[in-house]
């Protein structure tokens, strides 16, 4: 089975997908900024370019099916796929659908939902599947002591894992910064995923004071991170909730 991912140029997926071993092509698309209407003036041009490029990609790759999860790039790609007679499936990760999936609902052959009772889609197309999760993460978690050693931390101390999501969480980051000394004073360690935007700033502000702290912008090996944690504090993204519900660790 050959898989080609389509993402939005300049977004995180353009870096992360190749690192996971898959091909990806980018579309020059962005979301609509409801808080700054002037920033949306270029959206029609970006959409037009993305539709044209999506059409070209589909003709070259010739997929048997096109699957979208509601991101920026899903719109142009799935719209063109449906026009070319390629079966379209959309997957809605949240309890309330986003704008892209709502616009595509009539062009999809099937709509896979994470939660029951979503009324915004045609009932005859809806399949209650739950969210897809990486099951290998939860099978036989690594040895806690070895996992903590891999982060350069002390297995004798309690360890918190902080997950800010793919983009990071500024709210979480600011909370940890303000109370970091308290953690260090009571001997609690922190594996801190900051996200890319805040990583350099936080590292500079800490100025080498990293006793009992492992700081990283992104975590690729979630199995080891979960294994090391005594407590997990996480941003409540749709996929995060689905996966963390199976970890079996105390969770905030």
Language-model-derived ranges and their functions:
Residues 2, 12, 23, 82-145, ...:
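Active-site-proximal region of nucleotide-activated glycan assembly enzymes
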Residues 84, 227-229, 243-251:
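Conserved donor-binding/catalytic loop of nucleotide-activated donor transferases
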Residues 11-15, 63-84:
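An aromatic- and histidine-rich active-site surface loop
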Residues 15-19, 102-104, 117-126, 201-209, ...:
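Short loop/helix-cap segments at secondary-structure boundaries that form the rim of catalytic
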Residues 20, 142-149, 153-231, 241:
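Donor-nucleotide binding loops and adjacent catalytic segments primarily
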């Amino acid at each position: 089975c050959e898989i080609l991912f389509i993402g939005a140029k300049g977004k995180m997926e353009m870096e992360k997908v190749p690192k996971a071993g898959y091909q990806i092509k980018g579309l020059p698309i962005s979301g609509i900024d409801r808080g700054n209407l002037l920033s949306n003036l270029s959206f029609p041009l970006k959409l037009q370019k993305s539709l044209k490029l999506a059409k070209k990609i589909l003709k070259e790759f010739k997929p048997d099916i096109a699957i979208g999860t509601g991101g920026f790039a899903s719109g142009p790609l799935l719209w063109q796929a449906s026009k070319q007679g390629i079966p379209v499936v959309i997957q809605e990760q949240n309890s309330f659908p986003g704008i892209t999936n709502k616009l595509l609902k009539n062009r999809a052959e099937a709509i896979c939902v994470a939660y029951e009772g979503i009324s915004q889609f045609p009932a005859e197309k809806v399949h209650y599947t739950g969210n897809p999760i990486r099951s290998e993460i939860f099978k036989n978690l690594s040895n806690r002591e070895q996992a903590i050693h891999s982060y350069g931390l002390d297995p004798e101390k309690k360890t918190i894992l902080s997950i800010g999501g793919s983009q990071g969480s500024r709210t979480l980051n600011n909370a940890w910064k303000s109370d970091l000394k308290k953690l260090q004073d009571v001997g609690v360690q922190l594996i801190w995923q900051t996200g890319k935007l805040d990583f350099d700033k936080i590292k500079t502000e800490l100025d080498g004071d990293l006793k009992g702290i492992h700081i990283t912008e992104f975590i690729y090996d979630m199995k080891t991170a979960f294994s090391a944690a005594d407590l997990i504090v996480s941003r409540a993204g749709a996929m995060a909730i689905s996966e963390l519900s199976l970890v079996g660790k105390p969770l905030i």
